[in-house]
Regions:
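N-terminal Lys/Arg-rich, disordered targeting/topogenic segments
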Residues: 1-5
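Hydrophobic membrane-insertion alpha-helices, especially the h-region
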Residues: 7-28
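Auxiliary, metal-adjacent structural segments of Zn-dependent hydrolase domains
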Residues: 53-104, 113
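Short pre-active-site segment immediately N-terminal to the catalytic Zn-binding motif
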Residues: 104-121, 134-140
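Acidic/His/Gly-enriched intrinsically disordered linker/tail segments
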Residues: 119, 135-232
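C-terminal region of N-terminal signal peptides and the immediate post-cleavage residues
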Residues: 21-41
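Active-site-flanking alpha-helical
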Residues: 125-133, 153
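Acidic/histidine-rich, surface-exposed loop or edge segments in extracytoplasmic proteins
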Residues: 38-54, 105-106
Length: 232
């Protein structure tokens, strides 16, 4: 009987090893989030893991977190952040052509081109919104999720300076159709114009709803069961 137990234990361990290996091959992003060190990323503290031991990465994340707190009044999320200094690293953890990517409410990765305060804030803004919304976060339209992230990150590629007045870089009438568009298929391949349009619409929405307080009310209402379309 003891021998049989050892055989079963060995089989279970082997199967677990195969499962972990299969996950690493099929879903490197998930595997890297679970074990950053397995992909050559070292801990810089505070949940930040980077390919290169550089204090600048920690400062980038700290500044991004402060921007999130500055908008909402406080930060509720606590994401694991993976930062790559080379394209080889970024590809190994499942990255593609994007500068960064958030994963639900738990983690984000930054490419070499995305390791800056703007992109880090953008991705953390997604995570903060998702964390605050809880299980209903997928009910928020992509255009709002992305446009709000652009606004919070104050991305100069898509918004005019915050010196009062209209921040849209296109006429609002030109931007408005993004609300009814399919975010995943909108625009030409490789174009980021949809972020420009979403930023314009969301900036107007936030202004019309009382700023960050309006976003907090929206979150509260959605958690209480209201649909986003009912909050317009």
């Amino acid at each position: 009987m003891p021998k049989r137990r050892w055989i079963i234990t060995g089989l279970v361990a082997g199967l677990l090893g195969l499962a972990i290996g299969a996950t690493a091959v099929a879903a490197p992003s998930i595997a890297a989030i679970a074990c950053p060190q397995c992909y050559g990323l070292s801990s810089l503290g505070e949940g930040v893991y980077a390919e290169r031991d550089d204090d600048a990465y920690q400062r980038i994340v700290t500044t991004a977190e402060q921007r999130i707190s500055g908008f909402y009044g406080e930060r509720t999320s606590d994401a694991r952040v993976l930062i790559c200094a080379t394209e080889e690293c970024y590809q190994s953890i499942g990255g593609g052509g994007e500068k960064g990517q958030a994963f639900g409410r738990w983690a984000l990765r930054l490419s070499p081109d995305g390791a800056n305060e703007t992109i880090a804030t953008h991705e953390l803004a997604h995570i903060e919104l998702h964390k605050r919304l809880g299980s209903v976060y997928e009910s928020v339209p992509d255009w709002f999720d992305e446009g709000l992230a652009v606004l919070i990150s104050d991305d100069a590629r898509y918004l005019d300076p915050a010196n009062g007045g209209n921040r849209c870089r296109v006429p609002y009438e030109e931007a408005a159709p993004i609300v009814d568009a399919d975010w995943a298929t909108f625009g030409d391949a490789g174009s980021d114009r949809k972020y420009l349009l979403a930023a314009c619409v969301v900036t107007h929405w936030v202004d019309e709803h009382g700023g960050a307080a309006g976003v907090l009310t929206m979150i509260s209402d959605m958690r209480a069961g209201k649909k986003f379309s009912e909050l317009q």
